[in-house]
């Protein structure tokens, strides 16, 4: 692992561009520091190589930060789910790229905007569907929730599996 000081004010794509001189392999990984997952990195890389695209993003399910209520046309609540897993996938923050990806970046690039959208437009982005554990730690509340899980012994990201103590059906 090589740590590179890319400065706090550098956009995400610019940060990746700044590490180009350290990447000596045909493929390289980018991982966000705010995601916690039991994703099999070896399988993600195998999938990336099998797909043959410039980029691969781990696609994960996210939990809604809000309760979801469905209301019919008369104003009756027909369902209520507290912070359910959202349909579809989000960027899980584990990505694999071919060296060619550096050509899509400059020092002002925001990785999640133009560079990834361009890969999609060109048919060069794959999505690895991860159905296991994934959680983000963007807020103090997220930190508290993840630490509570750890204290209760639910640690799928380090190999221990079991039913989470209060996530209900969110994982």
List each model region and its residues.
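Conserved beta-loop-beta/alpha segment of the NTase-like Rossmann-fold superfamily
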Residues: 1-71
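Catalytic-core segments of class I nucleotidyltransferases/pyrophosphorylases
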Residues: 27-29, 36, 41-49, 61-64, ...
């Amino acid at each position: 692992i090589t740590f590179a000081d890319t400065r706090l004010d550098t956009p995400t794509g610019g940060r990746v561009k700044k590490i180009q001189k350290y990447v000596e392999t045909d493929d390289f990984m980018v991982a966000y520091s705010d995601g916690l997952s039991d994703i099999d990195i070896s399988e993600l890389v195998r999938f990336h190589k099998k797909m043959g695209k410039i980029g691969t993003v781990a696609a994960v399910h996210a939990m809604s930060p809000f309760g979801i209520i469905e209301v019919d046309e008369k104003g009756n609540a027909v369902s209520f789910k507290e912070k359910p897993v959202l349909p579809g996938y989000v960027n899980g923050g584990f990505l694999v790229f071919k060296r060619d990806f550096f050509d899509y970046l400059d020092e002002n690039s925001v990785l999640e905007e133009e560079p990834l959208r361009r890969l999609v437009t060109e048919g060069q982005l794959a999505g690895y569907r991860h159905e296991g554990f994934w959680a983000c730690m963007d807020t103090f509340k997220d930190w508290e929730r993840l630490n509570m899980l750890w204290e209760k012994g639910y640690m799928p990201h380090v190999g221990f599996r079991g039913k989470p103590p209060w996530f209900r059906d969110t994982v």
